[in-house]
Amino acid sequence: MRLMRTPLIATAVAIAIATTLTGVAVAARVLNVRDEGHLRFVTSDGSELIDEGPATGTVPGKVRVHFVYDGEPAVSARFTIYGHGGSISGKAKGRLSNPTSPDPSFRGAFQITGGSGSYIHIHGTGELFGVFDRRGSNKYGLVVQTIGKLPY
């Protein structure tokens, strides 16, 4: 009986190791994001400003941001980055450092809400930094930096 158990135990161990190694082989990749966008004003709808521009860094491409500013220190945004391998969408919340300044800086967090192409399974969170530039009536701009680790 003892001899019969040894092959069964060895088989069970081999299956466990194979299953573990298979899990490692298909583990998610992680995108260490460090991107920057210099965006220009496109249009507005009430307190929502829509800006677009180039993004450089880990996921270079074009960025479109729906930035919500209502005069309060709290700001929010929805964004999509259109890169070569697909798109990444998310949302963000932050606080302006000095809301009365013509170019207040802000800091907050972003959360990925979806992706396409190579980024279809992307998710995660990160930090957001930037400057909201108010250059006059309907002349707004954003400089935004993001840092995060995003599994995909």
Protein language model features and the residues they cover:
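Bacterial N-terminal signal peptides that target proteins for export
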Residues: 1-11
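Bacterial N-terminal signal peptides
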Residues: 11-20
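Beta-strand-enriched cores of mature, soluble protein domains
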Residues: 26-152
